[in-house]
């Protein structure tokens, strides 16, 4: 019965000896969740693309920030 429990628990098959005493070996239990991750080529930085054609947007945001700073400083 102990051999059957070890087989169900992921260890060696019935009647076989497991080096980890019924526990699955670390090498065979690795999964894609832990060590086999691939890089994603589709990652974008949340719409912030430095070096692309967003220079006008950055200039507008900068001008608004400077304008608000000057208005607050006058009061």
From Swiss-Prot:
Keywords: Capsid inner membrane protein, Membrane, Transmembrane, Transmembrane helix, Virion. One of its GO terms (cellular component) is membrane. Its main location: virion. It is a single-pass membrane protein. Residues 26-39 have a biased composition (Polar residues). It is found in: Virion membrane. Residues 19-47 are annotated as: Disordered. The chain crosses the membrane at residues 55-72. This is Protein P8. It comes from Pseudoalteromonas phage PM2.
